[in-house]
Amino acid sequence: DNAIRKVSAEPIVAGAEVEVIDGRGKFLMPGLIDAHWHAYLAANTMVDLLTAHASYTQLRAGEEAGKTLLRGFTTIRDAGGPVFGLKRAIDEGTLPGPRIYPSGAIISETGGHADFRMVYDIPEPFDCCGLTHTEKIGAAIIADGVDAVIVASRNNLRLGASQIKLM
């Protein structure tokens, strides 16, 4: 299960279940933790995040997760974005990647840092359908006022967020 069971300067008796790696002249370190990572921003351009099909950006994020693991990061805190499916795929062993602590959709007020609406998007009260592309894929949520932020936070927690990202 890719776990180091014992490190010793003394000889270890190798049995059928033991693999001994000669580490002389090498370094051993624990897995790194990245406390501010975005699977989607690391893997995709902003244009793709705003316009590409969700399946394309999902695949790119999965590839980036594998690369992140190979760079030595065994745990990451995703600071916002649609990673619940990616987390599940990694947890189940479908894809290689680090342990993910997800935030879910970034919560922002109208005109805030995570208001990724295009200039031609109609504000929600006047729009028949309500959700923008980034809201539909779970990248960001526009929440104006305390009640809306509470609802958005609860929705992220319901999906499995371990923390909430407000911008």
Model-predicted regions and their roles:
Residues 1-29:
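Histidine-rich, glycine-flanked metal-binding segment
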Residues 5, 61, 65-68, 148-149, ...:
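A short, hydrophobic secondary-structure junction motif
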Residues 5, 74-75, 162:
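Short acidic/polar active-site loop segments enriched in Thr and Asp
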Residues 8-9, 78, 166:
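Short beta-strand and adjacent tight-turn residues that come in two discontinuous sequence segments
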Residues 23-24, 79, 103-105:
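Fold-independent oxyanion-binding glycine-rich loops
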Residues 26-92, 110-118:
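Metal-associated gating/positioning segment near the N- to mid-region
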Residues 94-167:
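Metal-coordinating catalytic core of metallo-dependent amide/deamination hydrolases
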